[in-house]
């Protein structure tokens, strides 16, 4: 296991770090539960006006991304998955596929794309059954269903193998795919994945409750988001506006992600790069690192001691350097 000394970050980094957190904290701990209990069988927008407001915010945030080379709407048995391809400048033989955190949409990865494109070509998708431009049209009722739609989306892409990188719940989604359908996975990269190497602490669950309801004051969600981002203040940036709109206007209708067990982790055969935030409140970082180290048969575990759960916005260049080194080593085997 490697620990990384935190570099000094400019103020812009502290603006960035909060935008991930709202997507994965209040939405994960509240949105899934509310959606499963009361929503229609599929995820849906609460109103036409809410959908329009979200898509306007999505497009504004998307404008900060590099221009995609291609846009795919991939039909699966569970709905249509929006996938973007970005042409990279690096030497990687296989493309990266990026999975965002919950309730965010793929523009949450805006800070990561420039440095990851120096590794190679990148695909990024909106998770099915979540706010974004993917459209769910069949119930997703199990972990197997969650793996099935992602497997079908990858099968529709022209390449045969990929390095799959998941952020927060995207890390769980990537690992869940590896447990059910690993045919197209050259490697697995998890970025402070939740429900994967440790449970969500009860204290975090309790603190999330006021943020879980869309009719509660925005200040309550901001307070919880600041807590998960290590105390960083919430600022109005395009991605944060998109996330807030998604939490307000979209109702998810699928079960919460099941904790992946150590026994399941031990069955994974792909090389795994597990990147963990040392100050994450979404699991016990030491316990998570120990689990990854003791269960994964082919793993590299990297811990950033001063990173919060919003690690993707705090350390984008450092993460890309690790990904570059890891994928280069995997492809050289």
Spell out what each predicted region is.
Residues 54, 82-132:
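Conserved HGGG/HGGXW glycine-rich cap/lid loop of the alpha/beta-hydrolase fold
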Residues 124-165:
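Active-site loop/oxyanion-hole signature of alpha/beta-hydrolase fold enzymes
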Residues 166, 170, 174:
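Gly/Ala-rich beta-loop-alpha elbow adjacent to hydrolase catalytic centers
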Residues 199-205, 213-269:
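Conserved alpha/beta-hydrolase catalytic His-Asp/Glu region
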Residues 273-307:
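Conserved loop-alpha-helix segment in the C-terminal half of the alpha/beta-hydrolase fold
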